[in-house]
Amino acid sequence: MDVNPTLLFLKVPAQNAISTTFPYTGDPPYSHGTGTGYTMDTVNRTHQYSEKGKWTTNTETGAAQLNPIDGPLPEDNEPSGYAQTDCVLEAMAFLEESHPGIFENSCLETMEVVQQTRVDRLTQGRQTYDWTLNRNQPAATALANTIEVFRSNGLIANESGRLIDFLKDVIESMDKEEMEITTHFQRKRRVRDNMTKKMVTQRTIGKKKQRVNKRSYLIRALTLNTMTKDAERGKLKRRAIATPGMQIRGFVYFVETLARSICEKLEQSGLPVGGNEKKAKLANVVRKMMTNSQDTELSFTITGDNTKWNENQNPRMFLAMITYITKNQPEWFRNILSIAPIMFSNKMARLGKGYMFESKRMKLRTQIPAEMLASIDLKYFNESTRKKIEKIRPLLIDGTASLSPGMMMGMFNMLSTVLGVSILNLGQKKYTKTTYWWDGLQSSDDFALIVNAPNHEGIQAGVDRFYRTCKLVGINMSKKKSYINRTGTFEFTSFFYRYGFVANFSMELPSFGVSGINESADMSIGVTVIKNNMINNDLGPATAQMALQLFIKDYRYTYRCHRGDTQIQTRRSFELKKLWEQTRSKAGLLVSDGGPNLYNIRNLHIPEVCLKWELMDEDYQGRLCNPLNPFVSHKEIESVNNAVVMPAHGPAKSMEYDAVATTHSWIPKRNRSILNTSQRGILEDEQMYQKCCNLFEKFFPSSSYRRPVGISSMVEAMVSRARIDARIDFESGRIKKEEFSEIMKICSTIEELRRQK
């Protein structure tokens, strides 16, 4: 049946159809190859925006650095990073005047956090630049490697387990004349295989000690590794993002804690809240502006876009802000917070893997690593790449580029929001001292500006003043990409406002479908996504019912588990038909075992196993929920699991779903090909780390987990816990005397082994 698409929209207000214009169906674009070109673009652009600044040379690393602060104010509309220190400080002072005690209180809250945070806070987060191996690693491994190197170099403050003590080690490490690190390498030998008598290449992984002098260590400590941002929709060009190393992360965390605490107290801030809470906050600001614009006043809203927000921000400005925010605070606290911006003023951007060359004629491929870009003959490159390399050469050191101005993506979201809000705050009548006034919303680089004035000239004047005020602190509102409307219709962080927020359902589209974790989790996540969208995103009952049917269909095709009485032939159908015929109560079979679907929009909150439990044959129940079933490598599952769902914009969200452990909750095994590479040593470290943590959790289940007081190693803690538990179990008669004495013997043996070591 052909549907004329325009008919669909006859009854729909235009703003509700906004969803259909979003590029959110189908697979998002991914990047291939190296990010070197994108990173060079970022570095070159950042320097271009600040080109009239002062050049200096870093005395420790020898890197050329550009400082645009208090530079000449722009005379045109081009983006620029010449923030004026006194203007930023004044904006902070006015922000404090409008919110008495805000900085003071946030500092007190942060001080408490600083003293209590444990170093394991840094294990959160995904990829982290590991300076010991000069490449990216999972955060936990990178942290473990850093601590291991610190300890072998006599830096042991971190043993207390507090993050602030680890950071003391970081500061101390920068004064050391040299650091000794352990790196992984691989050797190849040709040997004859006994079985096949063929020659094979054998790879062995070794660890070797290496000394790094002060300059090289500092460069590594200040390095941000770069990657290409994947899965960005609606853009033709890819762009680079940064992953900082462990030395920087802890300091950034404390600065962002302070800034988050400030943002929570600012009504114009779109961070750190999200979802419905954010919508409520925004609706309040709009309501305020609309009620205050009496019949005599006009009210207009700009859906704002800033040009290259990160590349025009400056760490030196952030240092000024922190200095102001923490005035009158203890010296140690001010110092610890000022280190992050100082490190960022001296940061180095790692250029990534370099370029790949291939000769069509000779069928040869060769990689030019980033380290060689400083010296290689440029005749091999095309015009645009040649220009990039020529421009970046004065900044290169050891395959990294000095990048003093600018903030890489996503590092100081909260603090830059505070800066943005401080300009919105200046729109009050008592500051503008004229007939126009403004207010708005800020969330990282995204903003909406509401201007009220008696007439159109006033609105224009207000917008101009806002634009120029922003320029003074290095914020560049884009005149091309921002647009103005009567208040009541605007967009902010992909929320569309039309006398209230319109559900932008298209953004949720990517998270519908089968996740591909395992049969049990996928069923649960699928129905939870539909349930959540009925609650939050105007997914109506009829559409939800259709979504559910499509999901079940998709699920059956993915896992080849069509109903037992279907005609569809797959490689599972023989087994599933047999099961169908043997089962008395067919309604009790799970969908993944060829059973019928019992879900409808009323019971989406119930896990499938619970929904069908009463309908199941007894022997099926026994097979399904049997931890001793030998065919399943079974993990213990808490009642709630977390899935990562991909909404269309912003980072992957974590979504909770109910997990019932069954024989369908399998875990796929790790791909073996990694075991033959140089990553293998790293993998083994990681597995050992994992095993230790799992063992520790067995001794300290989360319900009884108290943070260890005093300093004891994991082993000591587990041994003493084992002794206490054994005694309680023995005295209450849960274990026999022989078992009790055996446990005690094992504990003593472990302690003995530790002493010998």
UniProtKB/Swiss-Prot annotation:
Protein name: RNA-directed RNA polymerase catalytic subunit
Species the sequence originates in: Influenza A virus (strain A/Victoria/3/1975 H3N2)
Intracellular or extracellular location(s): Host nucleus; Host cytoplasm
Function noted in UniProt: RNA-dependent RNA polymerase which is responsible for replication and transcription of virus RNA segments. The transcription of viral mRNAs occurs by a unique mechanism called cap-snatching. 5' methylated caps of cellular mRNAs are cleaved after 10-13 nucleotides by PA. In turn, these short capped RNAs are used as primers by PB1 for transcription of viral mRNAs. During virus replication, PB1 initiates RNA synthesis and copy vRNA into complementary RNA (cRNA) which in turn serves as a template for the production of more vRNAs.
The keyword Transcription regulation appears for this protein: no
Intervals of motif Nuclear localization signal: 187-195, 203-216
Post-translational modification summary for this protein: Phosphorylated by host PRKCA.
Gene, per the UniProt record: PB1
Annotated region (Disordered), positions in chain: 54-77
Domain RdRp catalytic per the UniProt entry, residue ranges: 286-483
Any one annotated GO CC term: host cell nucleus
Catalytic activity: RNA(n) + a ribonucleoside 5'-triphosphate = RNA(n+1) + diphosphate
Stretches with biased composition (Polar residues): 55-64
EC number: 2.7.7.48
